[in-house]
Design a protein with these regions (language model features):
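P-loop NTPase motor domains
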Residues: 18-31, 159-160, 164, 168-447, ...
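Low-complexity, polar-biased intrinsically disordered regions enriched in Pro/Ser/Thr/Gly
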Residues: 134-138, 254-265, 503-520
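Basic- and hydrophobic-enriched, low-structure N-terminal and domain-boundary segments
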Residues: 1-171, 175-177, 510-511, 542, ...
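Short gly/ser/thr-rich secondary-structure transition/capping motifs
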Residues: 144-151, 358-360, 461-462
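Short alpha-helical interface patches
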Residues: 88, 95-135, 238-249, 293-297, ...
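Conserved ATP-driven motor cores of ASCE-family P-loop NTPases powering translocation/secretion/packaging/pilus
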Residues: 439-541
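Short alpha-helix boundary/capping motifs
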Residues: 12, 54-55, 89, 368, ...
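A broad, low-specificity signal for short, low-complexity segments enriched in glycine/proline
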Residues: 122-129, 145-155, 174-175, 336-339, ...
């Protein structure tokens, strides 16, 4: 109690001294303004005015000082002092608010020195001869992707780094990451989306680099001249190609994601039937229409089994395997065939069937596409019973396998320039079965893989727990945006980032007024879950190898030097889409 009274006494004394100073200063100010004699008393004489408010001239010994002028000066000084105190308080509050809202200087995160030594342009260029052996003096954009900036330094990822982008809907993944990656890619690009927003910005720019094609089986971007037809049975004379194609189709059914009892078994049965049917169709020169007809019922697939049984180029045992599924007991057969029908259900849509039924002069050459730095846009919705997701997955697997073959025949067994797989909304669209492998091994063969997901929870749902963990572990660069509502993911991120020492100072007063300082140390999270969730729009948390977490200011494509040209390009493409939409819009019937 005594210490508290002492503190109160000191505070009161300070207030009195401050008030005395103001009252004394007001006398000097009023005397100067009115021409009266200057006060001669010290600061403490100002308190005497409170006892004789009507005669400040006598108290302050300032002849000619009028009371009205004096108290006006007092009011002015008190008002000025109030403004200064208010502004100082607001400045402190604003500083605290900025410290809470702006995570750039969070203790334990990467400093400018850390960024310089781990993610700068200089570090990237040191590895350039390994990344692009064909270039003598490469520039940073030729061997890497700029993610943003931190502490005035560019934050770069190399072309051999797998980049995982995590952010909820409307968190700016396309604005900050996908569009820039497509525009900056030094080689060919394969990109997916459920909407044509990235396409409208980048289509014209990529046309100036190489050939452009749009695989749009559901006509989400109808009116573009770069429409592509791709044969679903292309190359399936080769059993390995048929197996890869079937894996892409079967995985997109979701049977193996963990939500279906014995899902892995049924997905395997589906894959076995599909690879046999694809192989048979390719050997006998059949089309996607025949493949769809076979998928309608096991009895219709007898035709495919007969082709495999009689064709000399058929893979050994594939005909018998398909026949075994067809002749299985009804319950097993129907369950297995449910996956086959689901994988090819999209072919029931005439538009989709047409997109995978190219004419003789419409064949797509993936090798030429990759060698000429082409850009392929894959558009499909991720909802509905006739989603084209399985076709997109199969198409990507086809291109990836072609890229691997080209890389194997290239110097250093590396595709040069590298292929970018910008897989936006791939979790909603078509979960690629090979994504964990691509993330782990693709960089070494010249494949830059950048899946863009809404959360790790989405990855666990679409790929399963083990595969989702493999995707996370294999990503060299992890870009985490704010706004996540998954408490588990946020807690995992915070735990991965680690902890730091926080010092707490305590002032202790002894019995005789002596003060001592005690300092305690405790471990706290560098970035608690709340801080990660509250990352502002346009700011990301970048985890790069063993570097401290980098708080990065992302760059929007609208801030690029060529933004004006890109905006013009987007307007032209959107005009094409709108014109096509008006032409295909049904005319309402007129009243008779």
């Amino acid at each position: 109690m005594g210490d508290e009274l002492t503190d109160l006494g000191l505070i009161g004394l300070g207030v009195l001294l401050g008030l005395a100073t103001v009252l004394r200063a007001a006398g000097s100010l009023a005397a100067w303004a009115t021409g009266a004699d200057a006060p001669t008393g010290n600061a403490l004489t100002g308190l005497g005015v409170l006892l004789r408010p009507a005669d400040p001239a006598c108290v302050l010994r300032a002849d000619g000082l009028h009371p009205a002028a004096y108290w006006t000066a007092v009011a002015l000084l008190l008002g000025l002092l109030g403004v200064v105190v208010w502004q100082a308080t607001q400045a402190v509050l604003a500083t605290n608010h900025r410290q809470i809202r702006s995570p750039h200087h969070t203790p334990g995160t990467a400093t400018r020195r850390d960024v310089t030594h781990t993610a700068s342009e200089r570090v990237l260029l040191k590895r350039s001869r390994t990344l692009r052996p064909s270039l003598r003096k490469p520039t940073a954009p030729e061997v890497g992707y700029q993610l943003g900036a931190a502490h005035g330094q560019g934050v770069w990822a190399s072309v051999e780094d797998s980049i995982l982008v995590l952010g909820p809907p409307r968190s700016g993944k396309g604005l900050h990451m996908v569009v820039n990656a497509i525009l900056d890619a030094p080689g060919a690009v394969v990109t997916t989306s459920t909407r044509p927003d990235a396409l409208t910005v980048t289509l014209k720019a990529r046309e100036r680099v190489g050939p452009v094609a749009v695989f749009d089986p559901q006509h989400l971007a109808k009116g573009l001249p770069a429409g592509l037809r791709w044969s679903i049975v292309r190359g399936c004379e080769d059993p390995l190609t048929a197996m890869i194609r079937a894996t892409g189709l079967a995985s997109a059914t979701g049977l193996g994601g963990g939500s279906t009892e014995n899902g892995g078994f049924w997905e395997g049965m589906t894959r076995s039937a599909l690879q046999a049917m694809l192989h048979a169709a390719a050997l006998d020169g059949r089309s996607a229409r025949d493949l769809f007809a076979w998928s309608n019922s096991p009895s219709a697939a007898e035709d495919a089994a007969a082709i495999l049984a009689s064709h000399p180029g058929a893979a050994t045992g594939w005909g018998q395997s398909l026949e075994a599924i067809i002749q299985a007991d009804p319950r097993t057969r129907d369950s297995a065939w449910m996956g086959v029908k689901q994988a090819l259900a999209c072919l029931a849509d005439p538009r989709v069937l047409d997109s995978v039924s190219p004419g003789p002069d419409e064949s797509f050459d993936p090798e030429a596409f990759l060698r000429n730095n082409g850009t392929l846009y894959l558009l499909a919705t991720g909802a509905g019973s006739v989603t084209s997701g399985p076709l997109v997955a199969a198409f990507i697997e086809d291109l990836v396998e072609t890229a691997r073959h080209l890389a194997a025949a290239s110097p250093g067994a590396r595709l040069d320039p590298p292929l970018l797989l910008a897989l936006d909304e791939i979790g909603n669209l078509a979960p690629l079965p090979s994504l964990p492998t691509l993330m782990a091994e693709g960089g070494g063969t010249g494949l830059t893989t950048m899946p863009v997901l809404q959360s790790l929870s989405q990855a666990r749902d679409k790929w399963g727990e083990n595969a989702a963990n493999a995707i996370w572990d294999a990503s060299i660069v992890k870009v985490i945006l704010g706004g996540s509502s998954s408490s588990k993911d946020l807690a995992d991120f915070s735990s991965l980032i680690g902890e730091r020492d926080e010092f707490t100072d305590t002032h202790i007063r002894g019995e005789r007024g002596a003060r001592t300082l005690q300092r305690a140390v405790r471990r706290v999270a560098i970035m608690p879950a709340q801080a990660i969730r509250m990352l502002p729009f346009g700011i990301s948390l970048v985890l790069l190898r063993a570097a401290p977490p980098i708080i990065t200011d992302l760059r929007t494509w609208t801030a690029r030097p060529d933004a004006d040209q890109l905006t013009t390009d987007r307007t032209q493409v959107e005009t094409l889409l709108q014109t096509a939409a008006r032409r295909t819009r049904p005319t309402p019937p007129t009243a008779s």
